Design a protein with these regions (language model features):
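Lipid interaction determinants
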Residues: 19-165
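Bacterial Sec-dependent N-terminal signal peptides
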Residues: 1-29
Length: 165
């Protein structure tokens, strides 16, 4: 009789654990990343150099399928230029400065099999890129996330990201 109680108890426990919802795993790519380097390859000499003299930026994957990216030229935040937001009468110098910053937000999907993350852009600093998709081949080298654009026009770029603390 005791063994029957143990068998029934074990069966109930096994059933209870099997009925729990499996939480989807959060991709390793999730989190806030700080740009360590953005390089461009000269295909004639096969030499890598800093893109636009050096870039800074952040990349956020929230674990719920949302992505945010902001890239900007080195020194962008220290230019000493001030202008009001949502105003169409800012100086030409400020307008030119804004073009040194690139950002978008959207949704993302990771294909582990292909090592590609797709960014579906919901908003963008460039109106012509609203609704477009960017694909990035990625891999990890230690604690560094390394990405290369799949699309031909940006395929000479390589971005290295470190997890922000």
């Amino acid at each position: 009789m005791k063994s029957l109680k143990y068998i029934v108890s074990a069966g109930i426990l096994a059933f209870a654990f099997s009925c729990q919802k499996n939480k989807p795993s959060i991709p390793k790519i999730s989190g806030l990343w700080k740009l360590e380097s953005m390089k461009v390859r000269d295909t004639t000499k096969n030499i890598w150099s800093d893109y636009k003299g050096g870039m800074h930026g952040y990349l956020l994957y929230d674990g719920n399928g949302h992505v945010a990216l902001h890239l900007y030229e080195k020194g962008y935040e220290k230019a000493g230029i001030e202008f009001p937001n949502f105003n169409d009468s800012i100086p030409l110098e400020a307008l030119k400065h804004i073009t040194k910053s690139y950002y978008y937000m959207g949704n993302y999907k990771v294909s582990e099999a292909d090592s590609i993350v797709s960014h579906f852009k919901l908003s963008h600093s460039n109106p012509s890129e609203f609704g477009l998709t960017a694909e990035r081949r990625f891999y990890f080298s230690g604690d560094t996330l390394v990405m290369q654009p799949v699309e031909r026009k940006n395929s000479r770029l390589k971005l290295k990201w470190l997890k922000a603390k």
